[in-house]
């Protein structure tokens, strides 16, 4: 988990932010929460629960109210808002920035930004960026590919053929996100997202060949930066004694950051086309999400067949 994000990183990701004051402090100021403060009560002088460590975002309401205050009161208010813990001030909608805010920010070495975006939209963009940056993170050994728009994480023991299978899937028109190591973070209560570490982005290791650049070989359409992990495929070496699920009734899940992700175990055996099997597994999972379950259809057909045979047996016994 990233403990804090530099304000300079926020500026790079939200291009609508224009620096007005404190450019030299961008790398010094840190943001440790995705919550954003809209200092309304503070403008009236009420600071009992002022969240000083949050980004201070002022929109039309805050700026118009501050304009009604006299100079001395406005100066006192902005001096109290500007603390060493405050990451930055942002004024939306391209509104004029009070000179008292600029002076207070300069004293405490706080960057001040202006943006033409609407306040609510700007708040949403910043929150989304900070949620991703500050989210809990961990690395998983595996390969992440996007199959028909669905993120599929392929895991298994080293040497089982994860990268080779992913390469076959890329050749079939699907997209690589990460090979060997997948960095995973929790986006919300029901969503986990995977991406590649910067050093491994768009690269794959194929035994006997070495490192290959997937984007260079197959084009930009063969790669993607990140995707939601919706299905996990666990590759296992074939064990004749193992009892593999043949009908699809036993649905299993794997927990990632308290999010249960469906998992399918695929036994690896010479002659099995793993790429096609995984492709079909992804399509079958999507069909289940849309309400069609082939295993339930089979069970229904079997029940009807047994019922029909029972009726025939009853009819023959009466004769």
From Swiss-Prot:
It comes from the Bacteria. CDD domains: HprK_C. The keyword Transmembrane helix does not apply. Its cofactor is Mg(2+). Mg(2+) binds at residues 163, 205. Both phosphorylation and phosphorolysis are carried out by the same active site and suggest a common mechanism for both reactions. This is HPr kinase/phosphorylase.
